[in-house]
Amino acid sequence: MTTIPITKRGAEKLKQELHHLKTVERPSVITAIAEARAQGDLSENADYDAAKDRQGFVEGRIQEIEGKLSVAQVIDPGEVDGGGKVVFGATVQLEDEESGDTVTYQIVGEDEADLKQGLINISSPIARALIGKEEGDTAEVQAPSGIRRYEVVAVSYR
């Protein structure tokens, strides 16, 4: 079975969502189904149909999270010794060689990615181009507008 990398923060976030789904959402859906059943005829009961749809979503998400957590390899970026190289969990400061703009990204797992917060998916084109690079190296990324070149300015593990 293949493991999937996830940061300690990402694993905690998934565990919190799972707890919420099991302790709040699931009981709420069960109550909604019971209330809809009490209305009588289920063949044309929109409340019942909506509650059953919601139950399907909640149960599906619970299974999805449990599956991901069962194969997750939890990595604490603060404990990573990448030897100065860009690895999973590393925070990387980059300079666009064309524009001179600087950006900072942390390389995280699929469920944690949020570009607005500077969190990029390990399987994204830019993360794949950065893995193994060191400060001073240049990474080339295929973008819709053509190849972009970024210099690795700093690498940290936090």
UniProtKB/Swiss-Prot annotation:
> Key word Electron transport present in the record?
no
Q: GO BP, one example?
A: DNA-templated transcription elongation
| Name recorded for this polypeptide | Transcription elongation factor GreA
Record-stated family: Belongs to the GreA/GreB family.
Keyword Hydrolase belongs to the record? no
- What does this protein's UniProt record list under function? Necessary for efficient RNA polymerase transcription elongation past template-encoded arresting sites. The arresting sites in DNA have the property of trapping a certain fraction of elongating RNA polymerases that pass through, resulting in locked ternary complexes. Cleavage of the nascent transcript by cleavage factors such as GreA or GreB allows the resumption of elongation from the new 3'terminus. GreA releases sequences of 2 to 3 nucleotides.
Q: Name one Pfam family in it.
A: GreA_GreB_N
Q: PROSITE patterns attached here?
A: GREAB_1 (PS00829)
Q: Which GO terms describe its molecular function?
A: DNA binding; RNA polymerase binding
Enumerate the UniProt keywords alphabetically.
Answer: DNA-binding, Transcription, Transcription regulation
Q: Which HAMAP family match?
A: GreA_GreB (MF_00105)
Stretches assigned to coiled coil: none
For this protein, the record's InterPro entries field holds: GreA/GreB_C_sf (IPR036953), TF_GreA/GreB_CS (IPR018151), Tscrpt_elong_fac_GreA (IPR006359), Tscrpt_elong_fac_GreA/B (IPR028624), Tscrpt_elong_fac_GreA/B_C (IPR001437), Tscrpt_elong_fac_GreA/B_fam (IPR023459), Tscrpt_elong_fac_GreA/B_N (IPR022691), Tscrpt_elong_fac_GreA/B_N_sf (IPR036805)
